[in-house]
Amino acid sequence: MKFLQIIKHLKLQNKKNALDNFVNCRTYEHISNINKLFLNNFSSTKEHSEHGQVKHENFLNSTLKYEENSQNGSTNNLKNGKYNMYVSEGNVNINEEKYKDNNISSNNTQYNNNSSNSGSLNDEGPLWKEHIDDVVNENKKKKMNRFYLDSQATTMIDPRVLDKMLPYMTYIYGNAHSRNHFFGWESEKAVEDARTNLLNLINGKNNKEIIFTSGATESNNLALIGICTYYNKLNKQKNHIITSQIEHKCILQTCRFLQTKGFEVTYLKPDTNGLVKLDDIKNSIKDNTIMASFIFVNNEIGVIQDIENIGNLCKEKNILFHTDASQAAGKVPIDVQKMNIDLMSMSGHKLYGPKGIGALYIKRKKPNIRLNALIHGGGQERGLRSGTLPTHLIVGFGEAAKVCSLEMNRDEKKVRYFFNYVKDYLTKHLDYIVFNGCQINRYYGNMNISFLFVEGESLLMSLNEIALSSGSACTSSTLEPSYVLRSIGISEDIAHTSIRIGFNRFTTFFEVQQLCINLVKSVERLRSISPLYEMELEKKNPSNDDIPKFIWT
């Protein structure tokens, strides 16, 4: 699709606004997503904010009331374990009307623009109905439009973030550590402004508390290895770490590396909801314990740990507390002061920022937390992470944090709304499904569902136009069942039937509807050829007395 056609279709008034919309297309060949994405999120006027960002459009109604449809409904238990089994016979009635109003307004006025020219999901005008470039197969036959629902793996960059980054990728190119001229000062100021934005997001107190890294993996390695090696050098008796069995791979592999260096690691098993019990943590703390590390929001099942009480316990026992907040920062409220968090890892591309940038929060307190560096060189980042700072990535990370701090509440309402809609729809149309993880203490942008008698990989293949996953993006290339699901007591057979759905800021109601419709169709089709499902139905309905019974000898 040519650039001028995009301008004509969106009825934009200038090329600046057109570019802002064009750069955020998921792929150039799938321009049809502009309808479902931009016409719901961006205005088509000439107005821009102070730095030239496109002002954000209202696209959900904050007056909507959401049902806390957590663990209610018709519930059965499997013979092999305790799971929430939602069956179609349950009293689940979907009020379709409450899902039609998808016009949520935001309390944030900085990015709002109440333009009457913008489209909406229920818009009857030609802008909404007309598709520019539907995805076609090799035979030039129309297929379902592709869309993205794997937001725990990564998120698309917000156009406002990209708009903020562009000057630092072109004409503002100074090294932030070149303090002898204006070019360096300009970049240094941009970096410090980004630190401030991150601090505001998590309620930090000092710019020196933020150390920029290449991502959450490096931040986690720096936190665990840096802390353990430093304090072990001061006191050889200090060599114990506490974590859980459902951490991200980068935490688990780092702990295994430390075990090869003589450190002792306790891996706590969560309960069936995916929550680590405080009593288990308390009983695991020993005199030689250095630190505890627990993930804030689990990347596979979306469960939120009781971070505040864990932080208070660690403070009481005088041990350091680290949390991997790569899935939490910008999505759920974080207060590092109230939660007594000593170290926290964050990632840019998980909160609508660029890839290749992350941060480690290190609380400045008395005595200050000290740790050894992993990368040595010019002494940047207080000597903890040497190397020239990628100014454009840091600026994008900071702007993404700023946008999240302003729009977090609206984003949370939106994904909770989609979560409840999908849950209601599936429980009405399908039986033998399991919603994995706690359904109350969770981030609602993450859904992990097991469809019994359907192989998860087969389901993903049948939905190949919808970007979903069967678990963590770091391990989904293997056919092994999710270690997170196995750790919360789910059998291997059921773990193989699970898929993960990830909603985000740019997910539209149209996409959620298409997901539900195609999920039900695919599950029913795959179950129709499943002998295990047929056997299960025969067990439930043993009324075929007229059928002759054969005895094999």
Swiss-Prot record:
Pfam families hit by this protein: Aminotran_5
Cellular component aspect of the GO annotation: cytosol; mitochondrion
Matching InterPro entries: Aminotrans_V_dom, Aminotrans_V_PyrdxlP_BS, PyrdxlP-dep_Trfase, PyrdxlP-dep_Trfase_major, PyrdxlP-dep_Trfase_small
Disordered, as annotated region: 102-125
Primary localization: mitochondrion
Top-rank taxon: Eukaryota
GO MF annotation terms: cystathionine gamma-lyase activity; cysteine desulfurase activity; iron-sulfur cluster binding; metal ion binding
EC number: 2.8.1.7
Catalyzed reactions: (sulfur carrier)-H + L-cysteine = (sulfur carrier)-SH + L-alanine
Reported cofactor(s): pyridoxal 5'-phosphate
Function: Catalyzes sulfur activation and mobilization in iron-sulfur cluster formation (ISC) pathway for iron-sulfur (Fe-S) cluster biogenesis. Active when in complex with a partner protein Isd11.
Subunit structure: Homotetramer. Interacts with Isd11; the interaction enhances cysteine desulfurase activity of IscS. Interacts with IscU. Component of a complex, at least composed of IscS, Isd11 and IscU.
Name of the protein described by the UniProt record: Cysteine desulfurase IscS
Biological classification of the source: Eukaryota, Sar, Alveolata, Apicomplexa, Aconoidasida
